[in-house]
């Protein structure tokens, strides 16, 4: 498991990444949630740089997914792999999380209010069964890498929230590791209060901002397999 280090190795040329990101990704509803500057950063970075920008950007899960896209028929092969996994994850997590298929990846959002007590980084025992099922499905689909990103509201100091978000992300990742998700598949980051989804001035917004997000993307092995399938059929 790495802390603060981008985890996806890119194997696609910059020019191909530019074509994919300007044609496929920009049509995705979730990608449209990124503002103009953020979209430009991904497109301008190409395949090699998109994940490098995750640490300092809003919507890190979407950045991770956007940076992993290979596009074309190979991307469609990966998409089918993700479709099956996403359907299983929806059953595993139930009301605990929102599971969304985004391009060639999966974005998952879990509310911290369900995972943790207030100001705590200890995972509630009530969600253990769901997280164990989550880990089991990740084991069944081993050719992926997972970004785990913790977020808080703005109650408390910025440093406290940064620490809490990292501790919470670590706590969820530890449940996955305990249940045999290998540590080299995980990148765990805390973002503190820096990436709010909603207005922090009222409790409904703060509740939405307290969350743990996941991005599930293809690893190099799956990308190579997808490319080989395309070549074999042609």
Predicted regions and their residues:
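Amphipathic, membrane-active segments
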Residues: 82-110, 114
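N-terminal secretory signal peptides that target proteins for export/translocation
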Residues: 1-9
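Periplasmic peptidoglycan-binding/anchoring modules of Gram-negative envelope and division proteins
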Residues: 94, 116-150, 177, 207, ...
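Periplasmic OmpA-like peptidoglycan-binding domain that tethers envelope proteins to the cell wall
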Residues: 151-225
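Sec-dependent N-terminal signal peptides
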Residues: 9-18
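C-terminal motif of bacterial Sec signal peptides marking the signal peptidase cleavage site
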Residues: 23-27
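Short, low-complexity, glycine-enriched hydrophobic/amphipathic alpha-helices that associate
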Residues: 29-90
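Extracytoplasmic/secreted proteins, especially bacterial periplasmic and envelope-associated proteins
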Residues: 41-49, 65, 69, 84, ...
């Amino acid at each position: 498991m790495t802390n603060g280090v981008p985890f996806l190795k890119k194997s696609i040329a910059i020019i191909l990444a530019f074509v994919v990101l300007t044609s496929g990704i920009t049509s995705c509803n979730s990608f449209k949630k990124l503002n103009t500057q953020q979209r430009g950063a991904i497109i301008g970075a190409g395949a090699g740089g998109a994940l490098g920008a995750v640490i300092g950007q809003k919507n890190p899960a979407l950045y991770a997914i956007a940076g992993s896209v290979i596009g074309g028929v190979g991307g469609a092969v990966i998409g089918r792999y993700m479709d099956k996994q996403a359907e299983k994850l929806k059953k595993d997590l139930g009301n605990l999380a929102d599971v969304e298929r985004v391009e060639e990846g999966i974005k998952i959002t879990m509310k911290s209010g369900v995972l943790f007590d207030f100001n705590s980084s200890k995972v509630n025992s009530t969600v253990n069964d769901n997280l164990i099922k989550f880990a089991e499905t990740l084991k069944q689909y081993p050719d992926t890498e997972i970004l785990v990103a913790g977020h808080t509201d703005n109650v408390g100091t910025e440093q406290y929230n940064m620490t809490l978000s990292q501790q919470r992300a670590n706590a969820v990742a530890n449940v996955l590791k305990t249940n045999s998700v290998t540590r080299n598949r995980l990148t765990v980051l805390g973002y503190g209060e820096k990436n709010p989804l909603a207005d922090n001035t009222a409790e409904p917004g703060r509740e939405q901002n307290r969350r743990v997000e996941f991005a599930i993307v293809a690893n190099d092995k799956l990308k190579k397999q997808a490319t080989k399938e395309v070549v074999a059929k042609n």
